[in-house]
Regions:
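C-terminal functional modules
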Residues: 260-323
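Extended ligand-binding regions for polar small-molecule ligands
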Residues: 1, 7, 50-52, 114-118, ...
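Sec-exported extracytoplasmic/periplasmic mature domains
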Residues: 11, 49-54, 78, 145, ...
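Bilobed "Venus flytrap"/periplasmic-binding protein-like clamshell domains
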Residues: 17-26, 34-52, 109-161, 165
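Soluble extramembrane regions of membrane proteins in the secretory/endomembrane system
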Residues: 95, 104, 140, 148-149, ...
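Short, hydrophobic alpha-helical packing/hinge segments within bilobed ligand-binding/sensory domains
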Residues: 6, 45, 68-73, 163-169, ...
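Acidic, polar ligand-binding/catalytic clefts
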Residues: 46, 50, 54, 58-126, ...
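Extracytoplasmic small-molecule ligand-binding "clamshell" domains
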Residues: 2-84, 283, 287, 310
Length: 323
């Protein structure tokens, strides 16, 4: 195994290799019209590219099936996994990967045709049939077994390797329920021609914390990506945006100045550019900007932030201090 650090390898090749999902609207989705990748997970990766290479464009995206994601990290095929993965005990214990910081709190929900409901009550308890499409290699199968066992309802879970396969099985009637994290499922529903005929039920199967992932073997890289993610959250907490960053960096005093102008030695220790915080905010934006343009009110999905508000606004997002 090479003694080269991940950051040294990235800089040598002048590109960040990022593993992404096979395509979820709002999270990581290839825009064929503009020939580019878009989404919440993509913007998190862009922030890392800015911090290390100074350029949001120096990324090579590698779409991966759920079952291949952590192997690609372990083997060094990718430098960063930004594929909407849930933090779990088993994954960190078995896969030689580390999750950096919770960046999206979400939970699995269910979508079904309105015709599959016994009564006009939007709950799983009132579904006629339960052939459920879910993703292979995710946490969904175990969560579904536990949830429907609790309801004392039988169900048949069918696993698929890609969202396209799962969505097609659902559309063709092979499955009559589709289970995904709520933000992902909103994106899948948006792609249905008759989306108004499909209902996302009130049931919430789980609450999970999603995070980018890195190999456990390089502590510098783990720390670097962790603090890059925290930069996005703390920038929103301090109300620094891509629109006001130039003005605020000129006028900054006290803690805001400490945040925007971190010690050069500290940046060097983490392998980051000395201006990485200001560059990230300028080129990518803060957490709120990223959420709203990909998942929230400025996106086609128009989803509420729910738990993904700052702690000061009743949400679960928090960053340790930059001191």
């Amino acid at each position: 195994m090479s003694d080269q650090t991940v950051i040294e390898r990235i800089r040598q090749h002048d590109v960040l290799n990022v593993g992404v999902s096979l395509g979820f609207k709002g999270l990581s989705f290839r825009n064929v019209l503009h020939n580019c990748w878009e989404g919440f997970d993509i913007d998190l990766a862009r922030a890392v590219a800015v911090a290390v290479l100074g350029d949001v464009g120096k990324i090579h995206y590698m779409p991966l099936q759920s079952g291949d994601r952590f192997r690609a990290l372990r083997d060094g095929v990718i430098d960063l996994g930004s594929f909407n993965s849930s933090i779990t005990f088993q994954r960190e214990a078995e896969s030689d990967v580390s999750f950096v910081h919770p960046m999206l709190f979400d939970g699995e929900v269910l979508m079904t045709p309105a015709s599959n409901l016994l009564e006009p009550v939007e709950q799983a308890l009132y579904t006629r049939e339960r052939r459920i499409a879910a993703m292979r290699g995710s946490t969904t199968e175990e969560n579904l077994k536990r949830y429907f066992g609790h309801l004392n309802l039988s169900c048949e879970i069918r696993l698929f390797d890609s969202p396209t396969q799962a969505r097609q099985a659902y559309q063709q009637g092979e499955c009559n329920i589709y289970c995904l994290d709520s933000y992902l499922l909103a994106g899948e529903r948006a792609q249905l021609q008759d989306k108004e005929a499909h209902i996302i039920l009130q049931d919430r199967i789980s609450l999970e914390a999603m995070s980018p992932a890195v190999s456990s073997h390089d502590t510098q890289w783990l720390k670097a990506v962790t603090w890059i993610m925290r930069t996005l959250i703390e920038a929103e907490n301090l109300q620094v945006t891509s629109k006001n960053i130039l003005e605020m960096s000129q006028e900054a005093t006290g803690y805001l100045h400490t945040f925007l102008y971190p010690s050069e030695q500290h940046c060097k220790n983490l392998g980051l550019r000395p201006d990485f915080i200001r560059a990230i905010i300028h080129q990518v934006g803060n957490y709120g900007e990223i959420f709203q343009r990909n998942l929230g009110k400025y996106s086609e999905l128009n989803q509420p932030r729910r738990d993904n508000n700052l702690w000061s606004q009743g949400g679960m997002l928090y960053s340790p201090l930059f001191i």
